[in-house]
Amino acid sequence: MQVRLNERQQQVLWATVRHYIATAEPVGSKALAEEYNLKVSAATIRNIMGALEQGGLLYQPHTSAGRVPSDSGYRIYVDYLMTPANDLSRRVEQLLSDRLNPTSISLEAVLRGAAQILATLSGYITLITLPQTLTATIRWLQLVRVETSRVMLIVVTDNYETRSALMELGDTADTEESRIERELEVLTNFLNHQLRGRSLTELANLDWQQLDREFQRHGDTLRTLLQDLLQRSQPVGSNQILISGLSEVLQQPEFSQLQQVQTILHLLEDEQDQLWPLICEWSVATDAAPITLPSQQRVRILIGSENPLEPMRMCTLVSSTYQRGSVPIGSVGVLGPTRMPYDKVIPLVEATADYLSDTLGQPA
């Protein structure tokens, strides 16, 4: 703890943050004395709040008003005084499992559904990045004959995405049907042996020497096909962020000013390239201090002035990664006012990330 606080100061800071989160009103010593069992008088609480203000953890928005937490006060609360409501995690994961079925809907539909559920539960803006396509691993490949001389290569990745491309077999008029089918079977087995469990970036790195000589006449065609498939797997705007919960956050008093709302909307709609590195903490190092929850899931919290983007300095961003094995492939985040119930939002973000890791991130 960078700021040394005695036990009473910790209790008063904890109560002040909790009360302000609940009421959105500046907090006075009388309210804390009446509503929290601090076992000291209102006068003593007032003195302690004064000391916390001198330490930069509280401030007075107006001379006659009570006090509210500063960004530093929230940071001390989050890192040292808060107890996460971990009972939420199991309920959230069960809710996501009940409402989303990744085997019957698309990957993007799963992510959009998760974003909507998280926004509803948190009451804030939810941000979920699409998986980086080229980090996906190949689950299986298959060559399927679709016309007399045309074959489709189908590639299915571990995050339920499908890629396909057509190839010409050339003149097959004098080739027996059974031989063509056998060649396709051998080539399919070769591709699966070479590429299953490897990333899409490795599509062009096959050891063609292992392909039997009689089938190597298809090698150049397959190589070109795979390179084309790799090129098309690099989506335009691959740093896309799915956003939900705009209507929820507009109900917060911090966003009552039209200019504040317009600033946030501009960031979310037009400046995603700036926002993406902040939510994807696994790709960009920052000075923000992570906290470790009981499951050892790292959750990053950027509070107010810790945010490098000016439009977000009235906000907090809570984010975590979802993974394939130990490799991050995307991120989940909640964006709201600094006055948010961190003890609830952090487990919600963590549980959503865990669900996506379990559902979408299993190795091939």
From Swiss-Prot:
Gene Ontology terms for molecular function: DNA binding
InterPro entries in the record: GAF-like_dom_sf, HrcA, HrcA_C, WH-like_DNA-bd_sf, WH_DNA-bd_sf, WHTH_transcript_rep_HrcA_IDD
Annotated function: Negative regulator of class I heat shock genes (grpE-dnaK-dnaJ and groELS operons). Prevents heat-shock induction of these operons.
Annotated protein name in UniProt: Heat-inducible transcription repressor HrcA
Family: Belongs to the HrcA family.
Superkingdom, taxonomy of origin: Bacteria
Alphabetical GO biological process terms: negative regulation of DNA-templated transcription
Coiled-coil annotated residue ranges, if any: none
Entry keyword annotation includes Cell cycle: no
Keywords assigned: Repressor, Stress response, Transcription, Transcription regulation
Transcription regulation as UniProt keyword: yes
